[in-house]
Amino acid sequence: MATRLQYENSCDVGVFLKLTNKYCLVGQCGSKQFLHTVENRLADHIPVVETSIAGTRIVGRLSAGNKNGLLLPNTCTDQELQQIRNSLPDDVVVQRIEEKFSALGNCIATNDYVALVHPDIDRETEEIIADVLGVEVFRQTVSGNVLVGTYCALTNQGALVHPMTSIADQDELSSLLQVPLVAGTVNRGNECVAAGCVVNDWTAIVGADTTATEISVIESIFALQGSKPSNIINNIRNSIVDNV
């Protein structure tokens, strides 16, 4: 099931959240209503950690992680690193890395088995991603965009990518990732799909502007609430008929 939320005045929930199957990071915010809603949705299953990274709230864009590990930029302070380490399960490896692209969440899209990364990411960073996250790593673009972590939302169940991704590119990405994949949008047509939603294998949090049709596609491709990827066309067709 997908939950609509707004982080203060922003619908870009993926900028301020990092959600995996093992934990959720939440950027420190003045409004506790957002945090309480996230905790009510997730806290029975995984730890929800309110934190900052490099003194900022954009934890979703600065970090990359999965059930095995969490990667943080070298601008993350010692205090932040220690707090995050102490708050996550013991079997989650938390590592700070030296990388010129410090917005790791924009440059890495990962599930528990495979990761797409910015084509120009350091070779050493690629090795750390493979080691800490326990994934196979592919240097890739999404619809010609190098910021794969911005334009691809990925779980073990499926992937949502930039709406202008060609059918050939969708097929290639789906083959690499070994999951069903669809091109789509969030927040009423926004192309930055991973900035507008966070997803794991059983739930999704999407920006408050996300339409019913966009939510139907998200719930279908990520197999939430028992939806199947084959339902996507019917969901879109029904929405078009309703609008007509």
Curated annotation (Swiss-Prot):
Pfam families: eIF-6. Belongs to the eIF-6 family. The keyword NAD does not apply. This is Eukaryotic translation initiation factor 6. The keyword Cytoplasm applies. GO terms for biological process: assembly of large subunit precursor of preribosome; cytosolic ribosome assembly; maturation of 5.8S rRNA; maturation of LSU-rRNA; ribosomal large subunit biogenesis; ribosomal subunit export from nucleus. It is found in: Cytoplasm; Nucleus, Nucleolus. SUPFAM superfamilies: Pentein. Its main location: cytoplasm. Gene3D superfamilies: L-arginine/glycine Amidinotransferase, Chain A (3.75.10.10). It comes from Dictyostelium discoideum (Social amoeba). GO terms for molecular function: ribosomal large subunit binding; translation initiation factor activity. Binds to the 60S ribosomal subunit and prevents its association with the 40S ribosomal subunit to form the 80S initiation complex in the cytoplasm. May also be involved in ribosome biogenesis. InterPro entries: eIF6. Keywords: Cytoplasm, Initiation factor, Nucleus, Protein biosynthesis, Ribosome biogenesis. Monomer. Associates with the 60S ribosomal subunit. GO terms for cellular component: cytoplasm; cytosol; nucleolus; nucleus.
